[in-house]
């Protein structure tokens, strides 16, 4: 394997996709999202890139575990019991597979993500 296999997030992403959460998941605002995928494993279980989110709130159901590092903005993550965690630039955390709740972007947000979804 060569040095060319190292993924440099400063380079253009291999794929960029803009999307909205499903209509029934949107609780407020217009939470459009843009995902720049810099790496995706051949087996489809590991992905890494940069995510950008516009203001709004939607329900989430993580089937994958995801490491996040907030680069810009402010978001509030709430669990199914209503307990919340505010994350902002500089925060680093991992959301485990199985987490259910809501994600609210309070100020336009950008994060680096690395997600892994183990498949049977």
Label each PLM-derived region with a short phrase:
Residues 60-89:
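A short beta-strand-loop-beta hairpin characteristic of the jelly-roll/cupin
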Residues 88-89, 97-120:
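Ligand-binding loop in jelly-roll beta-barrel domains
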């Amino acid at each position: 394997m060569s040095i060319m296999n190292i993924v440099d997030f400063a380079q253009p992403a291999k794929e960029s996709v803009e999307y909205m959460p499903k209509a029934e998941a949107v609780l407020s605002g217009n939470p459009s999202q843009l995902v720049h995928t810099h790496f995706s494993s051949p087996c489809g279980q590991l992905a890494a890139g940069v995510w950008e989110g516009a203001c709004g709130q939607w329900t989430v159901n993580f089937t994958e575990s995801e490491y996040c590092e907030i680069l810009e903005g402010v978001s509030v993550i709430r669990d199914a019991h209503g307990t919340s965690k505010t994350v902002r630039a500089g925060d680093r955390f991992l959301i485990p597979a199985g987490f259910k709740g809501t994600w609210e972007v309070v100020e336009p947000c950008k994060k680096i993500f690395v997600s892994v979804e183990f498949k049977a």
